[in-house]
Amino acid sequence: MHDLDHYPKSTQKIRKQLEQTGLVISEYLPYQKPLKHHFPERNRLISGLSKGVLITESTIKSGTSITTNCALEQNREVYVLPGSMFNDMTMGNLMSAQEGAKIVISPKDIIDDFD
């Protein structure tokens, strides 16, 4: 699978592993450059293909927040790590919790929820 224009380039190592043993999908043609509106569309796929998503850090306006909103709309489980209301990097987590995401403090919380 050498004909896709991957973004970001920093994911090359894990991408190579996925190409060997997993699956790489795209809604776009090979060599199509990433455009701003592609990212929310990609995030919709990420959440749609998942049983649930774990949010570790998210600002109020971020790609992570878009993924969270997509997951909630798709009736996926959304888990968030708690954060400080004084930290911009976790304000998205707190807002997601208000919108229905489950607060978790250990991996066991998620495992128990899946059982």
Model regions and ranges:
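Glycine-biased, small-residue-rich flexible motifs in mid-sequence functional cores and linkers
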Residues: 1-115
